[in-house]
């Protein structure tokens, strides 16, 4: 399965080849995927080549051949329950009862922004609400939610970019494979993919430039699960 960014890049290369017969430059790929550096494109190209979707031709500049496309193009990134560039349900905290009627149902819900979260080197956890963002009611579901501003690029291959607003469902537990807010040693907060490895916890980046952190459970507190990304263009 491809991540969303891998699929977007593969589609962009394929469309450019069909239009002009020449693959896009790395700068064009970077701009098309809204990445900050070409190193992210290099990693995506390598991943696509390793999975057999493209082939780089030796001794030729900008020589990329698309070998195949995913059978289920609509599936995007293959991450269950999370589509990085789209805000999906379970956002905010639903207030039930009270008979507010149609006007109440259409009123935007304010979700608190609790500070910054590192997608890179963990940063000091922030616990105070700096402001709120308003979300439409059709995106709401049960449970309490908050938002954190993403800082860093360690989750770019999961479609999470520096400056995005991560929408978090407050929850002290997580399933293997979930992207979570992890508090380390009661001091540092980071956004990573959660996995259990024997008696330890692995916090995995989605960027080959960063290392997986393996920690004992007593050093890690799960403070919520990622349910969506809010991005301004």
From Swiss-Prot:
Annotated EC:
3.4.21.88
Site, Cleavage: residue positions: 119-120
Q: Which InterPro entries match?
A: LexA, LexA-like, LexA/Signal_pep-like_sf, LexA_DNA-bd_dom, LexA_repressor, Peptidase_S24_LexA, Peptidase_S24_S26A/B/C, WH-like_DNA-bd_sf
Catalyzed reaction equations? Hydrolysis of Ala-|-Gly bond in repressor LexA
Q: Which residues form the active site?
A: 154 (for autocatalytic cleavage activity), 192 (for autocatalytic cleavage activity)
Q: What class of enzyme is it?
A: hydrolase
Q: Which GO terms describe its molecular function?
A: DNA binding; serine-type endopeptidase activity
> Which Gene3D superfamilies does the annotation name?
Umud Fragment, subunit A (2.10.109.10), Winged helix-like DNA-binding domain superfamily/Winged helix DNA-binding domain (1.10.10.10)
Annotated region of DNA binding: 26-46
For the keyword Ion transport, the answer is no
Source organism, top-level taxon: Bacteria
Disulfide bond positions = none
> Which CDD domains does the annotation name?
S24_LexA-like (cd06529)
| Keywords linked to the UniProt accession | Autocatalytic cleavage, DNA damage, DNA repair, DNA replication, DNA-binding, Hydrolase, Repressor, SOS response, Transcription, Transcription regulation
Q: Which GO terms describe its biological process?
A: DNA repair; DNA replication; negative regulation of DNA-templated transcription; proteolysis; SOS response
Q: What does this protein do?
A: Represses a number of genes involved in the response to DNA damage (SOS response), including recA and lexA. In the presence of single-stranded DNA, RecA interacts with LexA causing an autocatalytic cleavage which disrupts the DNA-binding part of LexA, leading to derepression of the SOS regulon and eventually DNA repair.
Give the multimer and partner information. Answer: Homodimer.
Question: What is the similarity comment for this entry?
Answer: Belongs to the peptidase S24 family.
Protein name per Swiss-Prot or TrEMBL: LexA repressor
The primary gene name is lexA
């Amino acid at each position: 399965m491809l991540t969303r960014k891998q699929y977007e890049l593969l589609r962009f290369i394929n469309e450019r080849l069909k239009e002009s017969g020449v693959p896009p430059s790395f700068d064009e790929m970077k701009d098309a995927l809204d990445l900050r550096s070409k190193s992210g494109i290099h990693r995506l190209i390598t991943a696509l080549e390793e999975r057999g979707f493209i082939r780089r031709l030796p001794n030729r500049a900008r020589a990329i051949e698309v070998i195949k496309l995913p059978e289920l193009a609509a599936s995007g990134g293959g991450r269950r329950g999370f589509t990085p560039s789209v805000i999906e349900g379970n956002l905010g905290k639903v207030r039930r009862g009270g008979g507010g009627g149609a006007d109440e149902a259409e009123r935007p819900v304010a979700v608190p922004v609790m500070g910054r979260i590192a997608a890179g080197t963990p940063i000091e956890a922030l616990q105070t609400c700096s402001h709120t963002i308003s979300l439409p009611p059709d995106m709401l579901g049960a449970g309490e939610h908050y938002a954190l501003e993403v800082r860093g690029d360690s989750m770019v291959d999961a479609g999470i970019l520096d400056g995005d607003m991560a929408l978090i469902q407050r929850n002290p537990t997580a399933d293997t494979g979930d992207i979570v807010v992890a508090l380390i040693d009661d001091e540092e907060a980071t956004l990573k993919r959660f996995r259990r490895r024997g008696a330890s916890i692995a916090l995995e980046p989605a960027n080959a430039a960063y290392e997986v952190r393996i920690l004992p459970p007593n050093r890690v507190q799960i403070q919520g699960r990622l349910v969506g990304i809010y991005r301004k263009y």
